[in-house]
């Protein structure tokens, strides 16, 4: 579908959308075009009733509210672009409204659970296995910095300042920021760079910081698997992936007294409202502790 390839280029070059967002949008639009074909319609016959029918089909199949909201965002971006290109006479999605997604409190680790997970990863790396050294760095760096897993996998060696314990991150919308990390993450980084990465590096590795078993840049899906498997080692810890470590890092920073705007900068949130979600997590955890510990709770 050449038109989707052109739209993908538009999203990447003119809108600065991340690869993750573009992949999700294109998947939604392929679904829409398949729906159109099933009705015997062409793209220039796309209308508001057709869009509503497509969304209703997804809702009937059990699509989550957040999925429907993303589908609407995808189609609104696409139809506005297609109208601008002259491929649509009017924008049929202009009147579609994105439903407000429910904001749920994310699952987070207790601080003692986070320490147990880091200890388990360190223990696994003590034999010097290259993949175990890498896996320790993955969980340490995600928890230490709160960066996204896509940002972690996109790091090059030169993005890490080992002397000052800083990492330069290219985030959403191609916005660059710097995140500090502590001594444990620095120790994991040193072990990986000295003993792990050299054992896996190939001509295909390039400048990538993290590598897969075949020497290529580590894939996001592989990193997710590593986190899930490492967290599962700790009894009682909630099942979570990289985003759970990001949630936990933010919550623990706030519990430790960090300023909300500092946390916003560290996480790369464009809106303070997004960061404020973590204050609700911290307060709810405070309430649990208070209820359990205070004699007059």
Swiss-Prot record:
Keyword Membrane tagged: no
Top-level taxon: Bacteria
Residues in coiled coil: none
Residue numbers annotated as active site: 148, 172, 243, 246, 269, 278 (o-(3'-phospho-dna)-tyrosine intermediate)
Compartment(s): Cytoplasm
GO molecular-function term, one example from the UniProt record: tyrosine-based site-specific recombinase activity
PROSITE patterns named in the record: CB (PS51900), TYR_RECOMBINASE (PS51898)
Domain Tyr recombinase: 104-291
Entry's family note: Belongs to the 'phage' integrase family. XerC subfamily.
Name listed for the protein in its UniProt record: Tyrosine recombinase XerC
Taxonomic source organism: Mycobacterium leprae (strain TN)
């Amino acid at each position: 579908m050449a038109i989707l390839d052109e739209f993908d280029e538009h999203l990447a070059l003119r809108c600065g959308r991340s690869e993750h967002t573009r992949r999700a949008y294109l998947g939604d639009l392929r679904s829409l075009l398949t729906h159109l074909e099933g009705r015997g319609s062409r793209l220039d016959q796309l209308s508001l009733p057709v869009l509503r029918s497509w969304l209703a089909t997804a809702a009937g199949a059990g699509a989550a509210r957040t999925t429907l909201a993303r589908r609407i965002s995808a189609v609104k971006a696409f139809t506005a672009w297609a109208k601008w290109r002259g491929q649509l006479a009017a924008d049929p999605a202009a009147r579609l409204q994105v439903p407000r997604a429910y904001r749920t409190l994310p699952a987070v680790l207790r601080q003692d659970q986070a320490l147990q997970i880091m200890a388990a990863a360190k223990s696994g790396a003590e034999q010097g296995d290259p993949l175990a050294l890498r896996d320790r760095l993955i969980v340490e760096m995600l928890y230490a910095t709160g960066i996204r897993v896509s940002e972690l996998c996109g790091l090059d060696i030169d993005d890490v300042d080992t002397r000052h314990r800083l990492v330069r991150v290219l985030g959403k919308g191609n916005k660059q920021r710097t995140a500090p990390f502590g001594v444990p993450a620095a120790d994991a980084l040193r072990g990986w760079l000295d003993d792990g990465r050299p054992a896996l590096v190939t001509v295909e590795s390039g400048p990538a910081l993290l590598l897969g078993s075949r020497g290529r840049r580590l894939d996001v899906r592989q990193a997710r698997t590593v986190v899930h498997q490492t967290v599962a080692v700790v009894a009682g810890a909630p099942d979570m992936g990289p985003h759970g470590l990001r949630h936990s890092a933010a919550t623990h920073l706030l519990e430790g007294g960090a300023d909300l705007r500092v946390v916003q900068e560290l996480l790369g949130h464009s809106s303070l409202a997004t960061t404020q979600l973590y204050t609700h997590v911290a307060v709810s955890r405070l309430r649990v502790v208070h209820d359990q510990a205070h004699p007059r709770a």
